[in-house]
Amino acid sequence: MKRVTQKRAIQSVIIFASFTIGIPALAESISDPPPVLEPSDPNGKRVLFDNSHGQTAGQSDWVIDGAFSDFADALVENGYYVKEHRSAEPLTSADLDGYDVFIIPEAQIPFKAIEQEAIASFAEEGGGVFFIADHYNADRNFNRLDSNEIMNGWRRGAYDDITKGMSNEEKEALEGVVSSDWLAEEFGVRFRYNAIDHTVADTIVSPEEAFGITENISALSIHAGSTLAIIDPNVAKGVAYLPDGLTPEANKWNNAVDQGVYHGGGMEEGPYAAIGKKGLGKAAFIGDSSPVEDATPKYRNEEHGGTKRTYDGFIDQDNGVFFVQVVDWLAEQESYTNFAEAGIPLDEPSPLLEMELPEKTTEPQAEPWRQPQGDYRWYDRSTFAAGSFGSGQEAPLEVEYDLETPEALPLGGQTFSVTVELRHLEPNQTVNSLDMQVYLPGGRSISQIQGEDGSWPSSYGYHQIGTLTADATGTATKTVTMRLNPSVEADSAMIRLRNDRQNVVTQTVALTAASEKVTKHPTIQKSLKRKSVPVAIAGS
């Protein structure tokens, strides 16, 4: 017999494509010790990753033991001590004390004025800050603010009142947040609110004009991201640009709320990645989190508890090498306070559309872009789904689906047995929403399932397999009799099991014209590689 095992959260709102294996979620609260990564050959430099401003909201999982682990591991391999910052209290200078670089991945909760002051002071006194943003309207927790707005310091269409349209509870959660053109005033750049896709940043400033940051860099990937506007060329400089000739028709993100492309790409669109100098310290900026992430998310979605899906961006193009070189530059203190003193060519200020001026902006469409599901509220961790960061509750075990078939399904209308087994149900739980079919490439249905009364359906396609009831251990098993359309002549097909019309198992099966003895094979166990992450005893 041929057997395949799949795992699914039976109550999950989102189920991804066939053979996506559920990732075990280790729920942690904001008060749990943060992860720490220590190098075997330390270079004496310390890096702090922020996880106190919604970095795990929605499908994001921007933590050093989750979907930013490739980045963190690469830094550790280069000698950096890496830690996550997690706290329910505002960020302070004391939190940043002792660190060389502070990395802010795609924040979803605004910084209070005292936090902005702490970040600016950290840079002024010699620290390096790396701002990782995304595209406009990448609002993952439905608080009407995306990372570009948060890092800029002001909300599009609400420059005079950043809490415009919010509930009293939301306004209370944002006490101490003040609207201002903070990033431009402190660091000389502003994240644009564009949303660009279907291209690559392959116009790279030479290493000689970029302090070596772009050494061996030919291209950086972008998957729905933004660019920056250079406001003060004395302290801000682009290092990677998108191509010229971009158009809204070809290059705007599919869900962009405006034209998406503001200046046709190239230099006028502004840099995709940039660097900055502030006092004794430095800054770096990039308009997309996609090139930083990897495919190992740790937590569940805080809104609905679904399994997250992230992508291997860090290993795409020259992304990984670039980000490590950015941190190398940020961690090195240098005495010049502006780029003119450093003797490199200065950029021109970026052109701005009138609608990009903070006081002239309008809200292109109502925010948030949709209402949250259920009782989820971004400001109340007690509403976060089990398995998400901040919930403190372990995610329920995912239902495991086991499908056992003959090694080859017989043709010619001959009957055969298929056994379906579900594990990790509640004891005595019943499931009556399963159906199954065999189909050919291209989608032609070729199977029937015999009813419990011995009758056969009049058509080929999906058919219910009946009710399964779990035993005391949460396991339910049912064997059904099937047959294929006798007119079929093929060597292989697909068998698919669905639960409530959602695909849970899809497997290739061989077809044979003759009756053959079949043998039972052991269950295919698909395991997930889990990263072992040292955890601080006290105290990302």
Regions found by a protein language model. Name each.
Residues R3-A27, G539-S540:
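Sec-dependent N-terminal signal peptides of Gram-positive bacterial secreted proteins and lipoproteins
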Residues Q55-F68:
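Glycine- and acidic-residue-enriched helix-capping/strand-helix junction motifs
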Residues P110-A210:
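A glycine-rich, often tryptophan-bearing local segment used as a flexible ligand/cofactor-contacting loop or short
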Residues H53-T56, A88-L91, I103-F111, V129, ...:
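Solvent-exposed loop/turn segments at secondary-structure junctions
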Residues D181, G188-D294, P410, Q414, ...:
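Catalytic beta-strand/loop cores that center a nucleophilic Ser/Cys/Thr
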Residues L75-T92:
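A short, well-structured beta->alpha microelement
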Residues E28-K45, D258-G539:
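Extracellular ligand-binding/catalytic regions of CAZymes and related secreted enzymes
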Residues A27-D50, D65, A94-D97, L174, ...:
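Mature catalytic domains of secreted/periplasmic carbohydrate-active enzymes
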